[in-house]
A protein has these predicted regions:
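Anionic-ligand binding patches
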Residues: 134
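Extended, subdomain-level signal for the structured scaffold at the beginning of enzyme domains
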Residues: 1-109, 113, 122-130, 141-181
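Catalytic nucleophile serine of serine hydrolases
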Residues: 117
Length: 181
């Protein structure tokens, strides 16, 4: 499977676990995994955690990792599947026309797509969520509905070529279902 490539869309402030877990898990399965970002550079990921006394998650600096390829350089036809992690990166990568082009290709070709946490922001901007069932970080329920999708509060939601999850605690179920596609 080393000739089968999977693309991960990331950027600064992507959630460390949501990038690195699928990256390493898919390499274990024998895939050639590439990380794409708005530009080819060292990315700065973050760690989101749930701590007592906070009304929402906290954010701390996470791992740094080199992007293998810039969005503009990506030929999505070279990849068999797509992973879109959460964190804050989807808030701004969704505004990148090449990011939207990449996402649209995977849905037009019915290739497997895994999204988690805040990733629906990027998929919604690409116009591919309408009519889909998807999980997301629960506070994104209004955004999911505004995109014409059905929000499902579950650890691994499968709808056609899309496998989605709420956040990093859902990783095992999320990747297990994605690998089946």
């Amino acid at each position: 499977m080393a000739d089968l490539k999977i693309l991960i869309l990331a950027g600064d402030a992507a959630e460390s676990l949501e990038v690195m877990y699928p990256y390493q898990r898919l390499i274990e399965e024998g895939y050639d995994v590439r990380i794409a970002a708005p530009t080819r550079k060292k990315l700065h990921f973050v760690v989101h955690d749930f701590e007592p006394g906070y009304d929402t998650y906290t954010e701390k600096p996470g791992y740094s990792w080199d992007a293998d390829i810039a969005f503009a350089e990506v030929n999505p036809a070279e990849y068999v599947a797509l992973v879109v992690p959460g964190g804050r990166a989807p808030e701004y990568i969704r505004n990148n026309a090449d990011c939207r082009r990449i996402v649209q290709h995977f849905f037009e070709q019915n290739k497997p797509v895994a999204q988690i946490c805040h990733a629906p922001l990027a998929l919604a901007a690409a116009g591919v969520l309408k009519g889909k069932k998807t999980a997301a970080y629960p506070q994104l329920e209004p955004d999911v509905k505004a995109a014409g999708a059905e929000f499902v509060n579950s650890e691994a939601v499968i709808d056609g070529n899309l496998v989605s999850a709420r956040a990093w605690p859902d990783h095992p179920a999320w990747m297990r279902e994605f690998i089946k596609l």
